[in-house]
């Protein structure tokens, strides 16, 4: 297995390609246009709010319009705006719990407003009721036909659709199906059921990655060589290999004096891994399957308990109960 910190690691390349710690995603309405589900539901919500707002003004002119319906309009305006901003900034997974809570309250408000308006024989009140029903429904044609005949008590509602979408985990089958049509979202493959995180940061430095041995040639030492063997360097004292042996020095230093890249051997890598302490324990809240192209990552199942060496950054160096070590995404783990 490649040592941690290897520049060939795909995970390290992902973390170094412009994703810094605390960096916020930019606001882009292209994410809404490229997501058919978000584009359709937000468009219906905006249209419904405009219809309800204009109809409410006309109804208030005739008199007898319930004041509670105005609060519903204000609340739903901020709900629609909040969903729009979170989708445009790709922050749905960060704020999905808050979105579900606000939409649940909005569902109560809209249905209460519909109940206060839909039974009125006054035309502006019926138009306002149609707008509020549309705020609670996913299909425009169902709303129009139902508002002309009877209250659409059994019609699907966009709050319910949004609550069902944002209240489900990313690996849910219906949410994965909806996300598969979005252009900006990474489509989950058949091998993986994990949510996608876009906020990468630098991998926490470990003893293996942060302690690169310093190599010196005999000419550089210029008489300061030690006469006793040095632990961890094959061939005895430093500089002895160049004089008495044909074995390349540690780090790929051949006898011709041309240095190669310093790469630790397998035994030394295992020794350094064994010296790493794992003072933290974390429980997996999602299943994770390691990237087959990156030998540094480890796979684990939901509810697995891992030992963690460092909890800084988005990737943690962890050890499984069977002794396997590697890196794991921190947003799949919770500290115990």
UniProtKB/Swiss-Prot annotation:
<feature type="transmembrane region" description="Helical">
    <location>
        <begin position="38"/>
        <end position="58"/>
    </location>
</feature>
<keyword id="KW-0472">Membrane</keyword>
<keyword id="KW-0812">Transmembrane</keyword>
<dbReference type="GO" id="GO:0005886">
    <property type="term" value="C:plasma membrane"/>
</dbReference>
<keyword id="KW-1003">Cell membrane</keyword>
<protein>
    <recommendedName>
        <fullName>High osmolarity signaling protein SHO1</fullName>
    </recommendedName>
</protein>
<comment type="function">
    <text>Plasma membrane osmosensor that activates the high osmolarity glycerol (HOG) MAPK signaling pathway in response to high osmolarity.</text>
</comment>
<feature type="topological domain" description="Cytoplasmic">
    <location>
        <begin position="1"/>
        <end position="37"/>
    </location>
</feature>
<comment type="similarity">
    <text>Belongs to the SHO1 family.</text>
</comment>
<dbReference type="InterPro" id="IPR036028">
    <property type="entry name" value="SH3-like_dom_sf"/>
</dbReference>
<keyword id="KW-1133">Transmembrane helix</keyword>
<feature type="transmembrane region" description="Helical">
    <location>
        <begin position="68"/>
        <end position="88"/>
    </location>
</feature>
<feature type="compositionally biased region" description="Polar residues">
    <location>
        <begin position="190"/>
        <end position="210"/>
    </location>
</feature>
<feature type="domain" description="SH3">
    <location>
        <begin position="277"/>
        <end position="336"/>
    </location>
</feature>
<feature type="transmembrane region" description="Helical">
    <location>
        <begin position="120"/>
        <end position="140"/>
    </location>
</feature>
<keyword id="KW-0346">Stress response</keyword>
<dbReference type="Pfam" id="PF00018">
    <property type="entry name" value="SH3_1"/>
</dbReference>
<feature type="topological domain" description="Cytoplasmic">
    <location>
        <begin position="89"/>
        <end position="96"/>
    </location>
</feature>
<dbReference type="InterPro" id="IPR001452">
    <property type="entry name" value="SH3_domain"/>
</dbReference>
<feature type="region of interest" description="Disordered">
    <location>
        <begin position="226"/>
        <end position="273"/>
    </location>
</feature>
<dbReference type="InterPro" id="IPR035522">
    <property type="entry name" value="Sho1_SH3"/>
</dbReference>
<feature type="region of interest" description="Disordered">
    <location>
        <begin position="186"/>
        <end position="210"/>
    </location>
</feature>
<comment type="subunit">
    <text>Forms homooligomers.</text>
</comment>
<feature type="topological domain" description="Extracellular">
    <location>
        <begin position="59"/>
        <end position="67"/>
    </location>
</feature>
<feature type="topological domain" description="Cytoplasmic">
    <location>
        <begin position="141"/>
        <end position="336"/>
    </location>
</feature>
<feature type="transmembrane region" description="Helical">
    <location>
        <begin position="97"/>
        <end position="117"/>
    </location>
</feature>
<keyword id="KW-0728">SH3 domain</keyword>
<feature type="topological domain" description="Extracellular">
    <location>
        <begin position="118"/>
        <end position="119"/>
    </location>
</feature>
